[in-house]
Amino acid sequence: MTKKLWFLPIVCLFFILGWTAPSASAGAPADTNLYSRLAVSTAGGTTLFPQTSSAVITPSADTETYYKEASGKSGTALKSALHRIISGHTKLSYSQVWNALKETDEDPANPNNVILLYTQESRAKSKNGGSVGDWNREHVWAKSHGNFGTAAGPGTDIHHLRPADVQVNSARGNMDFDNGGSEYPKAPGNYYDGDSWEPRDEVKGDVARMLFYMAVRYEGGDGYPDLELNDKTGNGSAPYMGKLSVLLKWNKQDPVDSKEKRRNEIIYEDYQHNRNPFIDHPEWADEIW
């Protein structure tokens, strides 16, 4: 009998101190700073993803409805459907990009800073500019690849514009993306050679998915260049970016994370009102290319 009743003091302690079960009707989890409510189509409703930001992002789009036209398609049909879905977005001026990046790339641990793409360094938002020690606007799809410059359109599309250290941005220049080369001393984990740049592992997938977006959004029918991915480096001023086979591998090696989802949501809700399909559905890259 003594062995069977060993738990009674513990039960009594619960009744004395009081205990309340988590309420299912409360909506957000108790520790809301660890989660974002992101637009993911699931049979059971919204899926919660780990998130370092203190902000709780509410789904602004039912992605199943948003991508309805693309459902069941693959190859060129899928690419064309996605192009129609994400075209017609709100275009920013190049000066408006500064403030947009201060929100989309805000450091979740310090709201006064942004996270730089290639170094993942946190730097003051006020340090945007063109001097050593500043950060500027990196065109992941190099603007010389298609010569679209910084006019409203591909040159100001924040789905591929990211904060980067001025010197690192200059070192990357207009190189295509590939594996290999020498490590760039001011950005450990990044490698480069004569015609290509390899970003650090943490952002390889981010880079790939930004380039996939650009190749789908800009198809040449709306006054902008027809941007396409190929399996080459050294593309120069042609409207191409490589290296496609490597980008497809990076898309798998570095899966979509909560920071990308949060960024996609902010761009959709607050700025351009279109989404990057390859953040919502990274598997579509293999279905198209």
UniProtKB/Swiss-Prot annotation:
It holds the Pfam family Endonuclease_1. One of its GO terms (molecular function) is nuclease activity. Keywords: Hydrolase, Nuclease, Secreted, Signal. Its main location: secreted. InterPro entries: Endonuclease-I, His-Me_finger_sf. The keyword Transferase does not apply. The keyword Mitochondrion does not apply. One of its GO terms (cellular component) is extracellular region. Residues 1-24 form the signal peptide. Residues 25-51 form a propeptide. Its EC number is 3.1.-.-. Residues 177-197 are annotated as: Disordered. It is found in: Secreted. Disulfide bonds: none annotated. Mg(2+)-activated ribonuclease which hydrolyzes RNA apparently nonspecifically into oligonucleotides with 5'-terminal phosphate. This is Extracellular ribonuclease. It comes from Bacillus amyloliquefaciens (Bacillus velezensis). The lineage of its organism: Bacteria, Bacillati, Bacillota, Bacilli, Bacillales.
